[in-house]
Swiss-Prot record:
Species the sequence originates in: Pseudomonas aeruginosa (strain UCBPP-PA14)
HAMAP family to which the protein is assigned, alphabetical: PRAI (MF_00135)
Reactions that this protein is recorded to catalyse: N-(5-phospho-beta-D-ribosyl)anthranilate = 1-(2-carboxyphenylamino)-1-deoxy-D-ribulose 5-phosphate
Name of the encoding gene: trpF
Enzyme class, first EC level, given as a word: isomerase
Name assigned to this protein: N-(5'-phosphoribosyl)anthranilate isomerase
Keywords: Amino-acid biosynthesis, Aromatic amino acid biosynthesis, Isomerase, Tryptophan biosynthesis
């Protein structure tokens, strides 16, 4: 299988972004949602993005942000990709001069394929754990057997991933990418460099085992 891309989300410090890049992560995520313990402001986000080495993708995570708020952030922070985690419609996600991912939470009984089809312009679909009232970062995994065989878009797997279970997740789901936040933290918003390395190694070793 092709190399599974890896995103380390909830980055709040330059040193954590650099540690993620050094470990081999393909992307880092910055949370622009004030209610999150991993939220960053524009100044900190710009500092982190400017410190990234070449070819590491910067992703901005938003939850029901207004166009005005989005515009202010995008004018100040050179993000490569947007990730929408709220109740945004397709038209809310488009027109920002950036490709985007739409996160869908795996609520039991939902038609995930149908919901994904409502975002034809999305670069990919991220599947996360459903917890009532929580848009993401729950730290809980969902039943991977519920993931459809074909979403019609690149699939990003999130929700409760850790260095201990991500290898099994990659083997079972075969996603385009995996996204982790709490599973590689020392505390909320502070990454553990050793756990980041272990997570990346677990993903890469699973691919080597299959070649």
């Amino acid at each position: 299988m092709p190399a599974v891309r890896i995103k380390i989300c909830g980055i709040t410090r330059v040193e954590d972004a650099l540690a993620a890049a050094a470990a081999g992560a393909d992307a880092i995520g910055l949370v622009f949602y004030a209610k999150s313990p991993r939220a960053v402001d524009i100044h900190r986000a710009r500092e982190i993005v400017r410190a990234l080495p070449p070819f590491v993708t910067s992703v901005g995570l938003f939850v029901n942000a207004s166009r005005c708020e989005l515009g202010e952030i995008l004018d100040a922070v050179p993000l490569d990709l947007l990730q929408f985690h709220g109740d945004e419609r397709a038209e809310d996600c488009e027109g920002h001069r950036r490709p985007y991912l739409k996160a869908l939470r795996m609520k039991p009984g939902d038609d995930i394929v149908g919901r994904a089809a409502a975002y034809p312009g999305a670069a990919g679909i991220l599947l996360d754990t459903y917890v009532e009232g929580v848009p993401g970062g729950t730290g809980a995994a969902f039943d991977w057997s519920l993931v459809p065989a074909d979403l019609g878009k690149p699939l990003v797997l999130a929700g409760g991933l850790t260095p201990d279970n991500v290898g099994r997740a990659v083997e079972q789901v075969k996603p385009y990418a995996v996204d982790v936040s709490g599973g590689v933290e020392a505390s909320k918003g502070i990454k553990d460099a050793a756990r980041v390395r272990a997570f990346v190694d677990a993903v890469r070793s699973r691919r080597r085992d299959e070649t």
